[in-house]
């Protein structure tokens, strides 16, 4: 795999260039909210240890650019705060068993003026079944476990989407053998300034499974 060049400049310049590289239109208000989100993540991280990533530049790449890379593919069809900022007409619910993470999401919903964003402090398997168009995971579980735990929250005709690193061939084989869900497509992602493999795994119920 060839190296991905870094993006020079300050956070605002790097964000603008990353959006251009992703062909993702982001107005001034959206960009301001995205930068405030990263600033608040840095502040909360000093006290609550939300993420092991400490370097502000790497936080920009691995938490912001990485999440932005899924916005356009999902619209053709991370996550969380970033999706709510970039797509105000989507209703986004973040589910996490770690209370400090859901508290942070709620704080961001208020601080950034995101009425379309909410957080549920629970485990996905403990939620009452929802009727979601899309359920997306990032660094969560194997494809089979993800489908087993989250599949009941997807409406008929809806989609499960897993954000992965390199294509997980063993997980795909295990999922297909189980028979309830099938991989519809695998979409490679290019994250600006990140020299690592990323892909989206799109899954739908197998015919006859509702």
UniProtKB/Swiss-Prot annotation:
Q: What GO cellular-component annotations does this UniProt entry give? A: cytosol
- According to the record, the segments passing through the membrane are none
Broad class of the protein's primary localization: cytoplasm
Query: Single GO molecular-function term?
Result: rRNA (guanine-N7-)-methyltransferase activity
Matching Pfam families: GidB
Q: Which Gene3D superfamilies match?
A: Vaccinia Virus protein VP39
Q: What is its EC number?
A: 2.1.1.170
Q: Which UniProt keywords apply?
A: Cytoplasm, Methyltransferase, rRNA processing, S-adenosyl-L-methionine, Transferase
| Source organism, top-level taxon | Bacteria
Q: Which residues bind S-adenosyl-L-methionine?
A: 78, 124-125, 138
Q: What class of enzyme is it?
A: transferase
Name the catalysed reactions: guanosine(527) in 16S rRNA + S-adenosyl-L-methionine = N(7)-methylguanosine(527) in 16S rRNA + S-adenosyl-L-homocysteine
Role this protein plays: Specifically methylates the N7 position of guanine in position 527 of 16S rRNA.
In terms of PANTHER family, this protein maps to: S-ADENOSYL-L-METHIONINE-DEPENDENT METHYLTRANSFERASES SUPERFAMILY PROTEIN
What family classification does the UniProt entry report for this protein? Belongs to the methyltransferase superfamily. RNA methyltransferase RsmG family.
Name the NCBIfam families on file. Answer: rsmG_gidB (TIGR00138)
User: What is the protein's given name?
Assistant: Ribosomal RNA small subunit methyltransferase G
Gene designation = rsmG
